[in-house]
Amino acid sequence: MEKLEARPSSFSRVTITELMIPSYANFGGKIHGGILLSLMDKVAYATASKHSGAYCVTVSVDTVDFLQPVGVGELVSLMGSVNYVGNSSMIIGIKVISENVKTATVTHTNTSYFTMVAKGDDDRPTTVPPLMLETKTDIRRFVEAIYRKKFKMEHAAYQKEIKKNRDPEEIKRLLAGERCEVGV
């Protein structure tokens, strides 16, 4: 197997800008979170595919922070960068900003991290190029992603523990003082 040449994050950095139209609004008059999630998935795909040179799929969305609402008529720019690469996976950092075109006010509205996996022609995970860390920001993002991966693995073990079957006495103790009523 040939060795893949490392690519800098600048190679695959992607920005998508879209006007927020009335049909994107929720009942509160702001842009629906699902619209923003769909756009984030699009920029994550474009970024990961550009880095890997392959078709990519979303395998997880680690966090989506909704920091500020987005209004109808604003321009939203979604910026994606490869923060980490594994063998076939990549963690894509996404920053979303909105611009009020009337006031020229720019607001950071969302931050998110998508884990993408590159697929080969056989639809199986395929190796991606290493990431060339060229700046202190690149190094910081890569290290943060290592910690994010570690936390994610610990969280998965924690979730498994939560889902364990509990004995009835433990359940009674857990529910004591909670705002619930048991009807069975």
Model-predicted segments: where are they?
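Hydrophobic residues in beta-strands and at strand termini
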Residues: 20-21, 66, 116
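Anion-recognition interface
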Residues: 29
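Active-site helix/loop of acyl-thioester processing domains in fatty-acid/polyketide metabolism
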Residues: 35-53
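Surface-exposed, Lys/Arg-rich phosphate-binding patches that contact polyanionic backbones
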Residues: 24
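Conserved interaction-surface patches within small, structured recognition/assembly domains
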Residues: 57-69, 75-83, 98
